[in-house]
Amino acid sequence: MPASHQRSMTFPAGKDEVFQACVKAVSQCGFRIVESNPEAAQIEARTRMGMRSWGENITIIIGADGRADIKSSCRGIQVIDYGKNKANVNALFSALGLLLPSPPQQ
C-alpha cells in the first residue's frame, strides 16, 4: 500500500465557497487538477515527480458543513514518502487558511 497522509478541517463557510477555495489552493500550491466535480464537491489533483518521489495523488472531498477532507498518497508502489504527503496536505490547508475565514479555535 502506498504511503499517505490525511487530515480534515471544518471552515465556517458553505460547501460551494470551500470548494472554490480548494480549487484556488490546489493551483497556488503548484498542483494540477485532473478532475473537478462541483456537484459532488470532489477534486482530484496530482503533484509533479521530484527527486524523492514519483509524485502524489491528492483527493479533496468537501462536506455540506464546510468540512474539507484532504488526502495525499504516493503514486505507484512507493512505500516511503519522506514526509512529502504530510507537506502536501499542510500546504493546502495553509493556502485555504488564507482564502477562507479561520475555523474556530478548539
Predicted regions and their residues:
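Ser/Thr-rich, low-complexity intrinsically disordered terminal regions
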Residues: 1-106
